Amino acid sequence: EVKLEESGGGLVQPGGSMKLSCVASGFTFSNYWMNWVRQSPEKGLEWVAEIRLKSNNYATHYAESVKGRFTISRDDSKSSVYLQMNNLRAEDTGIYYCTTGFAYWGQGTLVTVSA
């Protein structure tokens, strides 16, 4: 059974930082590109970031709205993917999901950016 479990969300002030984690099980994690996607009432579902495989030198790609502020990383030995978020803005508020190429999704973790 494939499982993805996100954690690390919560309330943070504008300009603050937060790190999200996602632990995977039930598949060979190192063989899959991983993504972070977020959902908000205002913007709907929005792709945030992608990290590829060791064979791709762990190449990363980002949505323009988060470029320079967010960093995606992975640890294949821990079957985990991370999202470091800096200089957070109100518009970053939403439920953040990790996905395996959009085939499998976690339950999400809520990030609220508010003073």
From Swiss-Prot:
InterPro entries recorded: Ig-like_dom (IPR007110), Ig-like_dom_sf (IPR036179), Ig-like_fold (IPR013783), Ig_sub (IPR003599), Ig_V-set (IPR013106), IgHV (IPR050199)
Signal sequence extent: none
One example of a Gene Ontology biological process annotation: immunoglobulin mediated immune response
One Gene Ontology term, aspect cellular component: immunoglobulin complex
Domain Ig-like: 1-114
Disulfide bond positions: 22-98
Pfam families noted in UniProt: V-set
Coiled coil: none
SUPFAM superfamilies referenced in this protein's UniProt entry, alphabetically: Immunoglobulin
Domain of life: Eukaryota
Keywords: Adaptive immunity, Disulfide bond, Immunity, Immunoglobulin
GO molecular function, one term: antigen binding
Key word Oxidoreductase present: no
PANTHER family: IMMUNOGLOBULIN HEAVY CHAIN (PTHR23266)
Note: This chain was isolated from a myeloma protein that binds inulin.
Stated name of the protein: Ig heavy chain V-III region J606
Species of origin: Mus musculus
